[in-house]
From Swiss-Prot:
Catalyzes the stereoinversion of LL-2,6-diaminopimelate (L,L-DAP) to meso-diaminopimelate (meso-DAP), a precursor of L-lysine and an essential component of the bacterial peptidoglycan. HAMAP family: DAP_epimerase. The active site is at C72, C197. It comes from the Bacteria. It is found in: Cytoplasm. GO terms for cellular component: cytosol. Transmembrane segments: none annotated. It comes from Flavobacterium psychrophilum (strain ATCC 49511 / DSM 21280 / CIP 103535 / JIP02/86). Belongs to the diaminopimelate epimerase family. Its EC number is 5.1.1.7. The lineage of its organism: Bacteria, Pseudomonadati, Bacteroidota, Flavobacteriia, Flavobacteriales. This is Diaminopimelate epimerase.
Amino acid sequence: MKLYKYQGTGNDFIMIDNRLQIFPKQNTALIQKLCDRRFGIGADGLILLENDQSTDFKMVYYNSDGNQSTMCGNGGRCLVAFAKKLNIIKNKTTFIAIDGLHHATINENDIISLQMKNVEEVNIHDNYVFLNTGSPHHVQFADNLSNFDVKNEGAKIRYSDLYGQAGSNINFVHQTSPTQFSIRTYERGVEDETLSCGTGATATAIAMKATGKTNSNNITINVQGGKLEVSFNQENSIFTNIFLKGPAEFVFETTI
């Protein structure tokens, strides 16, 4: 079985062409082992590219804990790059994921712009914002972000009574300019900080606009692994035409 490794701003994934249904999807232990950074290949998640009757392909995403999970923005961008490598698409595509249809384009510099699901509800609280951008996200400001204990503080909120057993991804934010924010994200399913989170970057951009921290509809999000751009339209409290833009790079391929 051939495996491909991709990364998008440091968020890394194992890709498998599963159009012939060769991968044992119910083998949680295998997914865990492949994603293990000491005993396997190492990745934040594993993604299967499968056939779909009405779109170019289907995305099936698993966290590194071996469980199928909700939408992954960086993973979606990497899967678009993978589909191009497999000659399934050229420079634009429509595919289906767990949260519905996604459109994407690839520019001349191999930067991928991925349309995310509309956000119709943003829950604003005193010291945090909660919203779903294909995956659930808690967004709050943090002082001294570079030295912040993301793993421990993120786990406290993720496992708190606030979100119950299902949990949430947790984003800690620092504003660096009127249109730029730095974030660090604790991802459920990985149960650790990741170098980047696409749905988290998207959630942060929308949360900052919804709370009046920025007036822009084009926001730069600096993550540990690089830079992402988020753009959207807003009408009252509804956000549409949301696009997550950034690099997605092939790392290597191997056979097991």
